[in-house]
Regions:
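Intrinsic low-complexity, intrinsically disordered segments enriched in polar/basic residues
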Residues: 1, 18-19
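Bacterial N-terminal signal peptides that target proteins for export
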Residues: 2-9
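Residue-level marker of positions within ordered structural domains that often coincide
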Residues: 22, 168, 206
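Short, solvent-exposed secondary-structure boundary/capping segments
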Residues: 168-181
């Protein structure tokens, strides 16, 4: 009789632990990071950060030199690659990925890499999904390096990304890898673009306070999922899906 009671008590304890664990799990899943969504007017391809983005005339690059200027105007400052005090392009060294090409930069950088002239310090547009922070996102507290989810209303695909660059007040730009990951067959930043308002960005303000840097998209995806972020847009407002 005593053994039955003892076993029954053990069973109750086990059930209680199981229920408490389930409740804790549900509570954790219920904690969603604050976010908001923006429908872009268009989306141009940004190749900044790629080591072969810009180079001397005659080299095979992902973009034209004009696009390295702010707002793509020749009379504006150069923001797409590093220049010296005489405003001359700083070339990559012999041990860099593309020797002789210009060092293309992004606003988000690897803070553990103190070498400003190392192309690896910047977000490679060929390998990482990133969006450009526009004025609207900045006013709502989005920081460079924060996570985002991006959805194409045309291809019906959703992916994780980070806020990797600035420089376009509209925010209507995304990395080459981002557009390709969304299903667009783009090759470079010279002429490729999404001309319709069909790309939706979900921003997660202050979601990367430690400025974690990523060298592969799989690392970025893993970090986003650990935070409980979502690339599912099925429950978004009708205008965003």
């Amino acid at each position: 009789m005593f053994s039955r009671i003892f076993n029954y008590v053990l069973l109750l304890i086990a059930v209680a632990f199981a229920l408490s664990g389930a409740v804790a799990t549900l509570a954790q899943k219920g904690k969603q990071h604050p976010s908001f969504e923006v429908l872009t007017h268009r989306m141009d391809v940004d190749v900044d950060g790629a080591p072969n983005a810009y180079g001397p005339p005659g080299t095979q690059t992902l973009d034209i030199l004009l696009n390295a200027h702010y707002l793509n105007r020749a009379d504006n400052e150069i923001v797409g690659y590093l220049i010296d005090e005489q405003k001359r392009p700083i070339p990559q060294g012999p041990k860099d990925p593309f020797p002789g090409y210009y060092i293309s930069q992004t606003a988000f950088t690897d803070i553990e890499n103190q070498n400003q002239r190392d192309p690896r310090k910047y977000v490679d547009a060929r390998n990482i999904n990133y969006v450009v922070r526009g004025n609207a996102a900045r006013r709502r507290g989005v920081r460079v390096g924060d996570f985002a989810s991006v959805f194409s209303k045309r291809t019906r695909m959703g992916v994780f990304a980070i806020v990797g660059d600035t420089g376009n007040p509209t925010g209507d730009e995304g990395s080459l890898h981002l557009l390709r990951d969304l299903g667009y067959p783009f090759l470079d930043g010279k002429t490729d673009s999404v001309d319709q308002p069909e790309i939706v960005i979900r921003f997660y303000p202050n979601s990367n306070p430690k400025h974690q840097f990523f060298f592969t998209q799989s690392e970025l995806n893993e970090a986003a999922m650990k935070l409980g972020l979502s690339r599912d847009f099925s429950s978004a407002p009708i205008a965003y899906r």
